[in-house]
Structure formats: structure tokens, C-alpha cells
């Protein structure tokens, strides 16, 4: 076909990217499958399934009759994602490597590789939409299946990138994607979705982290200064955490409500809705906008963690690359290192990395509004 466009599909060995490749071929594109390896199996002690994943890619590509290749970005990933991930933990943050991977690997060096192969577009199996709306430029829009929507992880995509990428399953429900895979007898039709962080696999997170972040025991302490147990290091705990604290006694469950990384203290209190877990403002840095930054002050919706219900907020000002944000309702466990992502309805505007939550309701001696919702 003389004017046939070429699409490189980023294939992970899962059902979403498999169906993405199929749909691109059905739509008349010249399709190339490209598998990306980001982590060395020798580091995984045999746990990582990358060999099986690539075998599934090969079988799918053979089945739908498209060529496929593998690329090795292990060194890129280690330098640009994993090193930052560990550095953030070492300073007491709780980072999100998926966001960094999308920015530095999938939609940077992987996209560059696709273009090298002669692609007009890169397609991935993400649940989001790339739509031309009223302004005539691409918009990053939530996937039809809001339960699977992945725009939270993709807020760093900009106009230039959006002009080069396609999201074939973004307009489908997950159940429809599996139905298509079954109908076309793809080997990945019933394959379980991957969860967690790729370089950790099924292993215990703490045991993995301990290989890279020193165990520095300290005290679990209440906000009144009472020691109630010992922890293995502030890096191993995150705000709002309940499981794995090992604090006994009567009464309600214990939760992490704060950390003093310099002094090696993890602050804990009892009760899922303790006021020390809530704040209604934050400062975000490392800002990224899909189009242009909004005129301020700007009221919109946001998420401070994946799958959170959208929360109304106002971006008041941006100074020295930092956004000062307040919320209409108290937010639970706003965590440094995670991202706040901004929306207008289903349109993703951009976001930034949470640097500092505001003072808690406990700090301000404020009561939580009646029936404050668990919004996580």
C-alpha cells in the first residue's frame, strides 16, 4: 500500500499490547512489534518473567503475522529510573517508578527507537485516549474504562509526544479487550494483568529494598513522644501504612502518620481517620503540562494517588517551579514522592511530584469535617 503508515507497538507480553497490535493491523497499518527489556534476569533470581513475556510476544506476533524485535534498555532504565527510585527512598520519599519509566524510557528512548525503525507512530496498550478536541491540538483523555485509566502515570506526555503516539485500547473496556483476544485466539487472552513494580516482581518489597537502602532501626513514636515499638528504617514506611508495623496492644489499628527522616523516627497513631493523616494543601515540584500551564489561580480536579476519586483543588501560584495547591476537602496520606495529577473532567492537564504536604489537621488543631470521606 503506497501511503500505508507504519506503527511500532510496544509489546509487553500482556493482553492489552497484544490486542493493540491486532487492532492496528486491522486498521490497515504496517505493524511492527517491539519488546522492551528493562531489567536483567540475573538480578531477579529467576523471579522475573521477561523470558516468558517475550515468548508470548513472539507467539502473538507470529499468530497475527507481524514482525517483531526486542530492544535492551537495561542500562538506560538503571541510570534514569532505578537510580532515582532508590535515591528518593533514601531521602524518605515514596516514589512512583512507573511515571519516571514512562517519561524517561517508554516515551523517550523507546519512542526514539520506534522512529529509527521507520515508524510514523508508537502505539502502546495504555488505557487512555489521545483525542483532538476543540482547540485542535492533542489532548490526553482518560480511558473509557475508568477503573483501568492510566493517565495518572502519563501526565508527563507533551504535545510533541502525543502527535507521535496511539492508544488503541483506550476507547475500550477491559472486558472488551479480553473478548477481542479470545475471538482471535491470542495466547495472552487469559493472561493475568501484571501488578506491582517490574523489577521487584513477586518478591517481598522490604527484602528487595534492603539490598539498596541501609536498614537503620529506630523508634515508632506517637505524636506525644511515646515509644511504642521499633522500626527497620524510615525509608521502609509510607504515610497511611497500616500493615507490617508490628505494634501490638488494644484499641484501633496503628497507622503511620509522619516521618522524621533526619532523626530516624516514624510517627504512628491509632485510627484510620486520625487528624494527623489529613491535610488540605501541598507543594508540588517537577511540574509537567500536557499543553500549556493554566492561568492562575486555577480550580480543577486532581488525584494524589492512582485510582483515587477526583478531588477538587485550586492551584494558587507557581514559584521557582513549585505549585502551591489547596483542596476543597481534606486529603488522606498525602505522600512526598508520589504525584499530584490535574484534570478538567476527563482531560489530563499535567501534574507534578508532591514535595511537601501541608500542615495536618492535627497540627492545626482542626477537626475533620463530619463524615470526611476515605478518598483513597
From Swiss-Prot:
InterPro entries according to UniProt: MnmA-like, MnmA-like_C, MnmA-like_central, MnmA-like_central_sf, Rossmann-like_a/b/a_fold
Disulfides per UniProt: 101-198
EC number: 2.8.1.13
SUPFAM superfamilies, A to Z: Adenine nucleotide alpha hydrolases-like
Subcellular location: Cytoplasm
GO molecular function: ATP binding; tRNA binding; tRNA-uridine 2-sulfurtransferase activity
Residue numbers spanned by region Interaction with tRNA: 148-150, 305-306
GO BP term (any one): tRNA wobble position uridine thiolation
Keywords recorded for this protein, A-Z: ATP-binding, Cytoplasm, Disulfide bond, Nucleotide-binding, RNA-binding, Transferase, tRNA processing, tRNA-binding
Interaction with tRNA (site feature) positions: 126, 338
Region (Interaction with target base in tRNA): 96-98
One of the record's GO cellular component terms: cytoplasm
Broad EC category: transferase
Record: active site: 101 (nucleophile), 198 (cysteine persulfide intermediate)
Chain residues that bind ATP: 10-17, 36, 125
Function: Catalyzes the 2-thiolation of uridine at the wobble position (U34) of tRNA, leading to the formation of s(2)U34.
Membership in a protein family: Belongs to the MnmA/TRMU family.
Name of this chain's protein: tRNA-specific 2-thiouridylase MnmA
Organism listed in the record: Protochlamydia amoebophila (strain UWE25)
Lineage: Bacteria, Pseudomonadati, Chlamydiota, Chlamydiia, Parachlamydiales
